Amino acid sequence: MQDTVTTSALLDPSHSSVSTQDNSSTGGHTSSTSPQLSKPSITPVPAKSRNPHPRANIRRMRRIIAEDPEWSLAIVPLLTELCIQHIIRNFQKNPILKQMLPEHQQKVLNHLSPDLPLAVTANLIDSENYWLRCCMHRWPVCHVAHHGGSWKRMFFERHLENLLKHFIPGTTDPAVILDLLPLCRNYVRRVHVDQFLPPVQLPAQLRPGDQSDSGSEGEMEEPTVDHYQLGDLVAGLSHLEELDLVYDVKDCGMNFEWNLFLFTYRDCLSLAAAIKACHTLKIFKLTRSKVDDDKARIIIRSLLDHPVLEELDLSQNLIGDRGARGAAKLLSHSRLRVLNLANNQVRAPGAQSLAHALAHNTNLISLNLRLNCIEDEGGQALAHALQTNKCLTTLHLGGNELSEPTATLLSQVLAINTTLTSINLSCNHIGLDGGKQLLEGMSDNKTLLEFDLRLSDVAQESEYLIGQALYANREAARQRALNPSHFMSTITANGPENSVG
């Protein structure tokens, strides 16, 4: 009995005092008249288990714990999930995607790394969400609208442009670009390169006999500065529609030299051959590249009778009257709709050549001669051409030393022309009388929507009244756009003689 009490006390101290008190009162013997008092001293208290029975933990037995949204019962992953994870980890070695169900394909694409080799992903993955992640991973600013709204097209166009901008002739392996062409040829439609690096010029080592007796240097051969030749690139892009080039060097710092910015004769010949062979090219831009008359004529000659060319931009170069005559010939031998020769060296003879071609042209809708020096002689020639031209809608003659004689002829154009919607004569010397002449012409015009006369010495009153006439024309155009059927019925009812005014 003593052993029983001792064991009970070790197991549960709360019962030790009761057992000792009972033993002392009975003198070590159990009383038969009080069995209820002696029962705790006989029956040991069960010990607390360190690993209680699962039923003791109600929370553990619950399969759903509503108050803990992050809790979940540990289960074995589905076999499909294990397979998807394995495919993602080994996609570069075994790129299976087309054989999977659509919902499984989406799971794989959502977890693929954007750093996978293009040889694996280019012609296999068409998901725009995947290419969106690739673009955002490489470039913090992405304007997908400039690339037709396609993230895949944007990725390949910008990736190719980045390679071209950092290509160093004689140093960079051409295979870097040529190997990419089969992967991107179906997606690249626009190439915009604003930098072409020249070859690295190493210091020439003088050989014995290269110096004269006086110690002066002998005659040294001028190093070549030709840039990357675009022939193979353009030929490899079967859907190329726009080519925008600037032969310039950025961030040259202390390594500045004038020959870094040369558009060489060989560059010109190579580029001319490339664009002549590209029968899908619709827009060609070559700006800020010091293109003179000779190089411009080479470029323009390669574009004669081009089947689909619609826009030519040679702005901000060194093109003079000879280059303008070449552009005038192009107007007669192409389907060109936009011609931009802004900020060049075109004078009156060049403008007269363009005017002669414009008088018989039926395709051109926009002509930009801003920041040249055609003066009144060239301006009047263009005004005469516009009296017969029925297709031009936009004319920019800002900053061309124009004055009142040109304004007088343009007022006659405004009275009879029904296609022009935008004219810019800013930064000229139109004068007070010229402004009045233009106002008189605007009184009979119902189609012009924009007329820029800033910094042209026009009286404030004339400028205000011209603005009122433009507002009326824009309001009428808006009404026609909102209800074209009503406008046509009105013309039919009133007859053609009453349709204006």
Swiss-Prot record:
Start-end of Low complexity biased regions: 24-34
Pfam family, one: LRR_6
UniProtKB keywords: Cell projection, Cilium, Cytoplasm, Cytoskeleton, Flagellum, Leucine-rich repeat, Repeat
GO cellular component terms given for this protein: cytoplasm; cytoskeleton; sperm flagellum
Primary location class: other
Domain of life: Eukaryota
Region listing for Disordered, in residue ranges: 1-56, 202-222
SMART domains, A to Z: LRR_RI (SM00368)
Compartment(s) of residence: Cell projection, Cilium, Flagellum; Cytoplasm, Cytoskeleton, Flagellum axoneme
LRR repeat positions: 308-321, 335-355, 363-383, 391-411, 419-439
GO BP annotations, alphabetical order: flagellated sperm motility; microtubule-based movement
Gene3D superfamilies according to UniProt: Ribonuclease Inhibitor
Ranges annotated as biased composition (Polar residues): 1-23
CDD domains, alphabetized: LRR_RI (cd00116)
Quaternary context: Component of the nexin-dynein regulatory complex (N-DRC). Interacts with DRC1. Interacts with FBXL13/DRC6, DRC3 and DRC7.
Family as reported in the entry's similarity comment: Belongs to the DRC5 family.
Function per UniProt: Component of the nexin-dynein regulatory complex (N-DRC) a key regulator of ciliary/flagellar motility which maintains the alignment and integrity of the distal axoneme and regulates microtubule sliding in motile axonemes. May play a role in the assembly of N-DRC. May be required for sperm motility.
Name this polypeptide is given: Dynein regulatory complex subunit 5
